[in-house]
Each structure stands twice: as C-alpha cells, then as structure tokens.
C-alpha cells in the first residue's frame, strides 16, 4: 500500500496486518508517526517524511505561491524514495492524488495488479462544480486544471481497478471512461472508539431537556466554497428560529472570509477542534448539516451518526448513501437553501423525532460502519481480484 500522506489509512491498516495481507506500507508523515502508532511492525513501514516537512515549510514561507509545481516536485521526490525501498507484491493499493505514476509503472513492470483510490469525483466534474460555485460566490475567476490534477486523471486510466468510498465517486469516473465493472464501492468507516453514542443517562437527560435548552445545528467542515456553507446560512437566515443556534467548526479559507462577513452574528464559529475531541460537540447538538457542493464521502457525517445525530446532507456527498431518508437523516439537492431550511424546521418542530432519528443513526453506525468492517470488505475485494487475475494468467 502506498499513500503520499496519511489520510484515512491509519484507521484500518492494522487490520490488514492482522489478516496477514500487508506486505509494506509507504506513506508520508511526521517522524513521530511510526509503525507502532499504526499498529504495524517497523520492518513494514517506509515513511517518506522529508516530503511532509517540505510541504509544511513551503506553506509557511510561501503560502499558495508556486504551490502546484513545487508540490509536483515533492510528490516525485516521495515516489523515488518509495522505489528505493520497493518490495514486489501481488497488489499495489494506492491513493490517487496525482503522485503515483512512477509507482504504478513499477507495479505493472512487476506484474502486480493496481488498485487506485480516488477520494473525490473525477477532476473534470470537480472543476465544473467548483467553477460554478466560485462564480456564484463572486470570489475568484475560473479555476483551471493544474498538472497534479491532470496526473490524477491520467493515473486513474492506468489502474486495473478503482476503489471508491461512494457510488457518487464511482459514477463520476465511469462517466469519464473507466470501466464501471472494475470500480468497487466500499463506504468508509468511523472510529467507534472516539465517536460513540450517549450513555443511557445522558440520552435520558437530553430527552428531558428538549423543551428548555437551545436547539443546536452543527456543521463540521473546512469553510471553503466546496462545502456549501452559504446555503446553510441562507436557510438559517430564512428560518429565524427562536432558542436555536448554528455552530460551525472548521478553518476558514481566505476566499471565504468576505463571504462569511455578510452573515456576521448569524452563527458561532470555532476554528479548530481536534478530531478526537469532537464527540462532545456532536453529542450536545440536535442535527448535523453538511451542505457540500462536492464531497467524495465526508467522514464527519459518519462521525455525527455514531454520536447520535440525524444528518442532513446533499446528494453530492458520498455519505448521503448511508442515509435512510426519514429514518436517520435527509438528502437534499445541492445549492438549495429552501430544502435545507425545510428539513431543519421539520426537526426543530419535532424534537422528539430528531432524537429518535439520532438513535437510529447510532445503531446503524455501530452495526455497519466500524473500520474493522471496512477492512473485512477491503480484504475480500483484494482476494477477489487476485483470484480473477490468477485465473487470467493461467488462461
């Protein structure tokens, strides 16, 4: 497995080691992130840490200036480091982020099968959606594809299989020419050690307090154009609900600061909360809303469900596929403040229903969405394609 960063792999890679299917893990993280932190023997991990420090140094000194060409250089640097420690395997599983072409070429040279994992929709679809959104917000000119995104598109077409966290992502790549029959969808999981339901006593207390405490809507996401915060703000402005509050947790991008200024006083903002500390914010809220324009999955939806919240999110968010509308959440169209307002008001007027939907979300998360379950499905996929590949070679 190779990933130029950490992303979600640290949540389940220990299960691959336990099952005996992991040969080596190439990644890029700070020096403090060692094999023992991942549940792996040091002999199986290769950390291209210099890339990670170079990226952070560039961001500190230059910000966004020359980001694309320098990151492309850093990515190639990481790949060459990985190749110096290469070990042939039956399957290369790698995250598609425009930084794998050398590794994919080497894997094919070795006769290995290659699984590429895109975490967002195809770059062309993503560009179209974001260009429309930038124009709508009036915050910047049209975005053009950069070399890293073009590399991602090219890499996808050289993979034997794609692994997607949602059907939304799978359909996007299929529209752009990748064989639909070679795309496997496995929804991502949630760490149930950190994100857990309320205790029975807490739940009873929350039920008793329904009529006396404020109704809280929470959104946890970076505040960037892609996440669609303005549609939630417009919905909130329409509703004017008494004894209610809107909480945003997430860093604000420079491009969104002037946009948010138009809604000053309408919401409470916390710039950063460590992931393992989010539970208390979820558990003291009533509804989770994520109005994304595009989101390949959105782990925060699964986290909120595991903590007992009904979820309102858009059809362009992969995690929407987890929802049973009316039972544990609602799906709404993108860019529809009216639809968001309608669902929020429904739960505001029926707070007992919101509590019951949150309980249903809890049960689903606990039964179906642990990372151990994800790893089981992934290992089954590895074995399936290896068996198919072996038969093809024999014939």
Task: Please identify what each model-predicted range represents.
Residues 310-313:
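Short hydrophobic beta-strand element within catalytic cores of glycosyltransferases
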Residues 346, 353-368, 374-377:
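A short, well-ordered alpha-helix in the C-terminal region of glycosyltransferases
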Residues 293:
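Aromatic "clamp/platform" in nucleotide-sugar-dependent glycosyltransferases that forms part
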Residues 208-227, 233-237:
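Conserved donor-binding/catalytic core segment of Leloir-type glycosyltransferases
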Residues 56-69, 110-150, 193:
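Acceptor-binding helix/loop patch of EC 2.4 sugar-transfer enzymes
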Residues 256-279:
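Nucleotide-activated donor-binding/catalytic signature segment of Leloir-type glycosyltransferases, i.e.
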Residues 325-326, 330-337, 346-351:
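Conserved acidic donor-binding segment of nucleotide-sugar-dependent glycosyltransferases
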Residues 168, 189:
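Carbohydrate-associated surface elements
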């Amino acid at each position: 497995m190779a990933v130029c960063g950490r992303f979600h792999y640290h949540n389940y890679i220990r299960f691959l080691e336990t099952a005996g299917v992991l040969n080596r893990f190439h990644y890029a993280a700070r020096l403090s992130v060692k094999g023992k932190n991942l549940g792996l023997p040091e002999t199986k991990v290769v950390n291209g840490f210099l890339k990670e420090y170079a990226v952070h140094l560039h961001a500190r000194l230059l910000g966004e200036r020359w980001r694309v060409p320098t990151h492309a250089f850093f990515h190639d640097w990481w790949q060459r480091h990985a190749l110096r420690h290469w070990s042939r395997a039956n399957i290369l599983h790698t995250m598609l982020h425009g930084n794998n072409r050398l590794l994919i070429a080497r894997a094919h040279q070795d006769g290995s099968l290659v699984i590429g994992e895109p975490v967002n929709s195809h770059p062309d679809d993503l560009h179209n959606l974001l260009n429309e959104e930038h124009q709508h917000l009036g915050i910047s000119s049209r975005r053009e594809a950069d070399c890293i995104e073009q590399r991602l598109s090219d890499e996808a077409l050289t993979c034997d299989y794609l692994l997607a966290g949602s059907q939304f992502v799978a359909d996007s790549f299929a529209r752009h020419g990748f064989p639909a029959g070679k795309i496997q969808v496995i929804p991502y999981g949630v760490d149930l050690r950190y994100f857990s339901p309320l205790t029975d006593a807490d739940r009873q207390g929350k039920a008793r307090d329904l009529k006396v405490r404020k109704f809280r809507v929470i959104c946890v996401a970076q505040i960037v154009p892609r996440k669609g915060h303005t549609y939630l703000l417009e919905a909130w402005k329409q509703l004017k609900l008494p004894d209610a509050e809107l909480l945003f947790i997430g860093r604000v991008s420079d491009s969104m600061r002037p946009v948010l200024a138009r809604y000053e006083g309408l919401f409470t903002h916390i710039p950063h909360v460590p992931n393992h500390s989010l539970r208390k914010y979820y558990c003291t809220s009533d509804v989770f809303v994520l109005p994304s324009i595009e989101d390949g999955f959105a782990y925060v939806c699964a986290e909120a469900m595991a903590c007992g919240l009904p979820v309102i999110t858009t059809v362009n968010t992969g995690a929407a596929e987890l929802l049973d509308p009316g039972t544990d959440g609602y799906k709404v169209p993108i860019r529809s403040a009216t639809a968001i307002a309608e669902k929020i008001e429904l739960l505001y007027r029926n707070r007992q229903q919101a509590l019951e939907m949150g309980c249903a979300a809890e049960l689903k998360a606990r039964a179906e969405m642990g990372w151990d379950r994800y790893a089981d499905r992934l290992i089954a996929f590895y074995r399936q394609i290896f068996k198919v590949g072996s038969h093809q070679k024999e014939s």
